[in-house]
């Protein structure tokens, strides 16, 4: 995953899925705030 935007919601892929990655919590554990109930 890209170390550049991995903090925003890079989501294991390398795509800038900010809203999806952060909200869904599929940010490879690199999300700043893991939302409860995010699959």
From Swiss-Prot:
Pfam families: ANP. Expressed by the venom gland. GO terms for molecular function: hormone activity; toxin activity. The keyword Secreted applies. GO terms for cellular component: extracellular region. Coiled coil: none annotated. Its main location: secreted. Snake venom natriuretic peptide that targets both NPR1 and NPR2. Exhibits hypotensive and vasodepressor activities. This is Natriuretic peptide CnNP-a.
């Amino acid at each position: 995953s890209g170390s550049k935007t991995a903090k925003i919601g890079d989501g294991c892929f390398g795509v800038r899925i900010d809203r999806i990655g952060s909200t869904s919590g599929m940010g490879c554990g690199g999300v700043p705030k893991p939302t409860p109930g995010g699959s």
